[in-house]
Amino acid sequence: AVAKLLAAADVTAALEGCKADDSFNHKVFFQKTGLAKKSNEELEAIFKILDQDKSGFIEDEELELFLQNFSAGARTLTKTETETFLKAGDSDGDGKIGVDEFQKLVKA
């Protein structure tokens, strides 16, 4: 669903760059996919897709499945990748990423 908002070639390249376990780097991924150039409104729409349980936050279970939002056949993130991703985005320390935190993380 997220892939519809991005160029297919960019998504493919970004996913290729993190096929191996523990190779995911959110900053690189956001740059390669073009997410880093999206407006806050576009990022909010993407956030709502990533927030699969519609809680208003992206929790670790949803982060683990992050890549699959871009391609159904993509791998899940490892525990280490998920923890690193969460730590990078969770600026208030509540153990989850809100929409404002997500926007800041993507644009960082």
UniProtKB/Swiss-Prot annotation:
GO CC terms in record: cytoplasm
Location of the EF-hand domain: 38-73, 77-108
InterPro entries named in the record: EF-hand-dom_pair (IPR011992), EF_Hand_1_Ca_BS (IPR018247), EF_hand_dom (IPR002048), Parvalbumin (IPR008080)
Residues annotated for Ca(2+) 2 binding in this entry: D90, D92, D94, K96, E101
Keywords: Acetylation, Calcium, Metal-binding, Muscle protein, Repeat
Cystine connections: none
Protein task: In muscle, parvalbumin is thought to be involved in relaxation after contraction. It binds two calcium ions.
Record protein name field: Parvalbumin beta
